[in-house]
Amino acid sequence: MQDAVPRLTFTLRDEERLMMKIGVFVPIGNNGWLISTHAPQYMPTFELNKAIVQKAEHYHFDFALSMIKLRGFGGKTEFWDHNLESFTLMAGLAAVTSRIQIYATAATLTLPPAIVARMAATIDSISGGRFGVNLVTGWQKPEYEQMGIWPGDDYFSRRYDYLTEYVQVLRDLWGTGKSDFKGDFFTMNDCRVSPQPSVPMKVICAGQSDAGMAFSAQYADFNFCFGKGVNTPTAFAPTAARMKQAAEQTGRDVGSYVLFMVIADETDDAARAKWEHYKAGADEEALSWLTEQSQKDTRSGTDTNVRQMADPTSAVNINMGTLVGSYASVARMLDEVASVPGAEGVLLTFDDFLSGIETFGERIQPLMQCRAHLPVLTQEVA
């Protein structure tokens, strides 16, 4: 029997204000986001991600994002030791979808901005204007050291200076097709990119440090942040408030999109049992690697994404916000997320992506006031 959970009620004006976008964080790396021997074990493939994103599109998800990971954490589960590449994956997914927005992640230490500008313009053409770029500076030193391109530990304190120049080159090339930018990190000499994107290219970021938020406030279209805790859907509110305040300083509208994992079942008890089972199988060796790497950056402060990921409180799913409960409970908590000022959307992961998206679309989303504007589905995706 499904737990009885009160349905939130809003006036029409509140309902309009609380409309929230939903995205899926596709599993580009093995095993998704659960570092556990008890979680589903699988390799990343194009076919898996195609099925996930096509289901997400069917259920009116607004966007799909893939990360980039160049070296994993090892351990019994070989966590994230097996990864696809973000731009090529999303190019393929752009070709087999028609409405959902598609975002790839650029590891900016590995790709010159002019190459990213051209790749993005290409996927813009494939997708019909549905593509955007997530820019990351890089925090896991071994990812880059293995290729001989780690610039030294001083980079930790200068990475947003680097990213600022990077995005300025991108904006030049996407906006005018030409760049003569001269900076400390990049020198463009009549650099050209054509054709240009058919629509303004969206840039997103995931800054939680002061420097990261300042960058997003100046250059990003929206900023990702971690949800916090288990079944505490509004605990991220101070982070969203900081982002809102940073954006006010630049006079731009930069909303927060919040990362959550959904573990749902018919009842709260059944969902909680799954969560406890995953925690009991935590891959301690892989988690130790994460903790070790999080301590390498001694220059960016204590409020970075990786510090939160490695917190022992819930490291089994890298400490993203976790919503555990019945379908009605999860719907209620997501409506609470939507009520937080500055929260414009959520980026969701699931313990099992294919069944998770289906149950979300069939059992959770129809109960959400912040998704009440969606049309009723009339047919099932294959």
From Swiss-Prot:
Enzyme Commission number: 1.14.99.46
Family per record: Belongs to the NtaA/SnaA/DszA monooxygenase family. RutA subfamily.
Originating gene: rutA
Species whose genome carries this gene: Escherichia coli (strain B / BL21-DE3)
Keyword Phosphoprotein listed: no
Residues where FMN binds: 68-69, 134, 143, 159-160, 209
Signals that turn on the gene: Up-regulated by the nitrogen regulatory protein C (NtrC also called GlnG) and repressed by RutR.
GO BP term, pick one: alkanesulfonate catabolic process
Protein name per its UniProtKB record: Pyrimidine monooxygenase RutA
Gene Ontology MF: a single term: uracil oxygenase activity
